[in-house]
Amino acid sequence: PTLLWSLYNNDYDQAGSFFGVQAADRPLHAIYALDAGTVTLDNLSGTTQAGVTVESKVYDTSGNLLDDQNSATYSLTSQKVVNGILAPKVQTTSGAVSFVELLTKQNGAIVDRNVYWIPATPDVMASKTFGQPQASMSSYANLKALQALPANSSISATAVTSSVAGPAGSDKRVTVTITNNSTTKTVGFFLRADLRRGTATGQELAGDNELTTSIWSDNDVTLWPGESTTLTATYSSADLQGATPVVSVSGWNMPKIDVVAS
């Protein structure tokens, strides 16, 4: 409920919290429990799910793999929750930030992926506000290490448009594949794709060019070298106002790039 007013921006664009909530509601999902430092697995589907495992990977901000664990194999009945299946070994040195990547697999195939960034110095809530509608903090997490992430200029993207009927009167779908091609260990952190009005040569039009009415399947993703992800967005071709669809990809530690959604 505290995220209710943060799911969409005032221009209807999907904010980062939208995709966080969406991930948490996937049928099979692994969760890093901040209070316990362990992994919880849940089955929100209506049927039993068998052959389910979870792999947890811990990276530092330089891209070094610090910990890699695999769970036992589980069969979960509908609405089943299993706590403490893994305990990723995150950094505890003051000022450190760890990335935790959780890969949920069913019969060996990845069905869910989730990434957390965990500070060694966490948020501390003011105890007097427990149970109140608006809790306050007595101290904040130290995430300053993210400011020193190495730059990554090796993120690439492709975008393809197809005609397909979708929600809210949409008639087009753009499929975007983002890849981290870095030959070093550099992560691509919080990468976001946006659909924009542009030119046939891939330039964005001046002014307010984003199609905020487009609906994305996922966004704000984090990728390590060799990893890629595919996102889709549905939109109404009328919202282009005669322009060419162009997809921009930007991120915390990468320069913005634009590609034509041909």
Language-model regions, residue ranges each:
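Carbohydrate-binding surfaces of carbohydrate-active enzymes
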Residues: 1-219, 223-233, 242, 246
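Eukaryote-biased activation of long, low-complexity terminal tails and linkers
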Residues: 253-260
